């Protein structure tokens, strides 16, 4: 029986992870195998989802919920700060200059919950502060070193991961500290190690940094897994009286009235106030740079960047200042417009009569209808173009708006499939420049505008191109493109009064194009049952025959009127002649 082979561990290669990270960074710079595009202030950043999820709790939670999103727009983060964090994610190096730039990167790291970047910024802040004074005799003044604070995470537009605040502090209280384990590093060694750091660099292991080592020492003391014991003056060491002693400590939490964050210790609460909200001059560290704070008048949210403040206001006002030059769609952000322009196709130069196909440049989906393509784009842009004017709500899809109107306001939209509709003209003083055409309508009865008063008229819409029908509305920009495909014919019926007071029935057929006759009509659906209505389709022969019949009827009416006029004259002359004959005859007695 052969002896069992034992698994032996070969030599470790600590540089392997660095080589992998360098290769991933090269692929990112060359845009190879990237599966996510991040839009920050209109700038596109290519990256890998797996790398982002490994370095950020924010992206880890987001990619779990939205797995198929190839394009994500992030608000509340500046382009400069996000570029630094992307470089740190792929190179483990963080190069920043100035306090203002450091504050922006800090805010972005808190937003994205990148703990390693926050630790690196803490190291930088400690290096810029005054060096620690080495004193072997010790001091009575308490010293605190804060590692990281990640609870102040802003989640404005995207959901963030739910995590407990991470805060590690070391307090050297008044009195003496006795350590019985010789293998534990002292605070002086940690301080000297921290002063030797000259370049902010993370190698992927938290134990390599001095602050992480300090946190490790502190956690070992608190957990009691070492032989080291910390004795506090005034606290009993007897286990029996320890429970009674712990009752003397207050269990009340300290709450920040500004950001509603809670702390178990008063010292941590005061340090939070000094770092983020209050200072001797009433100005926090984040407000030292002299930036103006912009406050939203609707929701009282604060912004230190005016550009972010303006974009936020458009959510309340509904303003959309950026317009697409091709399809005239409007957007609230310029970055959303740029994303729309990459996929917008107007069909200019295409042959008439050929169906235009619209391809999405993000996911390569193809649509044969502009309405379907436009509804698909909002999935990538996140825009909500459908607006309810009754309750000021916005919806992403048109069917969501229709469902809302039906459920909330009891307004149901009837789909027009009949071919005969009854409409009335709207008398206005200003010139009319548009006409409503409803899909699948063969004939519409209207009263003509700018004509003599008549009884009725008939308007026929023929050869309506499908691209002209967008939500039952024809746009003027498309009218000029297809002048030969839409024409309107209407039959004018009138009565002409002759000099003798007789009314003559006259009919006249008119054929004009839509773009040459501006008409505006207000459609009203028939209340009767239109299912049994038979559509009337007028072809060219029927028009000619109706025109000939109208002319013939007018001629006959005119002849009848002349006959009625000449007949009384003949009768009167005959009676006169008869009377004269009677007077000329002799009277016989």
From Swiss-Prot:
Q: Where is this cross-link: Glycyl lysine isopeptide (Lys-Gly) (interchain with G-Cter in SUMO2)?
A: 255, 261
Q: Where are the zinc fingers (C2H2-type)?
A: 254-277, 294-316, 322-347, 358-380, 386-409
Residue limits of the BTB domain?
34-98
Q: Which is an annotated Pfam family here?
A: BTB
Grouped into one coarse class, the protein's main location is nucleus
Q: Which UniProt keywords apply?
A: DNA-binding, Isopeptide bond, Metal-binding, Nucleus, Repeat, Repressor, Transcription, Transcription regulation, Ubl conjugation, Zinc, Zinc-finger
Motif placement: Nuclear localization signal 2: 283-294
Protein name as annotated:
Zinc finger protein 131
